């Protein structure tokens, strides 16, 4: 089971881990119980809402016409043209069906273009060997990017010393890595818990340009959430390559790697291929998703929703005399209670909200389906639970309120 969807990440032994159907921001489990999803919304894949009628209709039309052929589907050409229209700095595109694949494609091409093996990274970039090699020799190198104590068993030992993590907004650390190693690629998420400081992204761009390093922005999570396209557009910094996923197909598998011609053409000197990257459903879903996004200005609406949620968390905390830390993109908002019992409180929220018909923890991926009425209902349900947490801060035993174990800690990236 996918790590992010395991019951242990939410409510061990009690979380209804499997679904029967979805619609909007509603999820039904296998027993027919209905829940309002105020959590990860398919791990951020459904910004338009689950089971979106227009996207699903386009997909069903493709299913009826045929999904696979000896020929290529024209939709991948149309999608490439659209992504390049949205990102004029790019000239070419390649498609896959998962974020990990898109990251692996980008690294293969960038290494081919630079002629160098070593990569500096900041953020979460999938599960492939090239990335997990960062933990060879020190299983905490990815602690601030993926998970603490991750043992990279199965990753060839000879990849040790090929990947160097650096911390977001720490330009001096990156510069030292570049000065002391033959770095050919810098790969990073554009924004993490907070935005760039002290012209960080511009300085990274300048460093990459001066040293002949390929700069890659991983927008698999951040793309199409605060801008129509990559969030790098907000900061006026253009990479050499970028990847998009999650929101791109509104729940259907499609990811994209775009880049400058002089970089992307290096793919011709190596081998990158997969049969099912040529299926038709993914690009069809992406084209319709982008059409709906552009018409509805979805990035503005989900940002507005997320901003409202973040403010109301703070208001609710103030009402109950709690101190919380709010972080993330507005449309990927998260909070944590400033307490040694923070993880227990997160578990308590999930437990109590589940009983009220909500899938909830301390992280919300906003979607168009999260209307004001839905958000109001969520906060009405959450209010007394914050009261319970305050009681625990004053001495009540939170463990006595829990019906099972405390949830596990999760990813440390944009959330």
Predicted regions and their residues:
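Active-site-adjacent loop/helix segments that line or gate small-molecule/cofactor pockets in enzymes
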Residues: 1-21, 44
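Conserved PLP-binding catalytic core of the aspartate aminotransferase-like
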Residues: 18-19, 307-311, 317-350, 366, ...
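Glycine-rich loop-to-alpha-helix module at the N-terminal edge of alpha/beta enzyme cores
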Residues: 34-116
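PLP-dependent aspartate aminotransferase-fold enzymes
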Residues: 81-185, 307-310
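Active-site core of PLP-dependent enzymes with the aminotransferase class I/II
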Residues: 170-172, 176, 188-214
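Active-site PLP attachment segment
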Residues: 235-266, 278-285
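Structural signature of PLP-dependent enzymes
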Residues: 289-314
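PLP-dependent enzyme catalytic core of the Aspartate aminotransferase-like
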Residues: 294-296, 304, 355-415
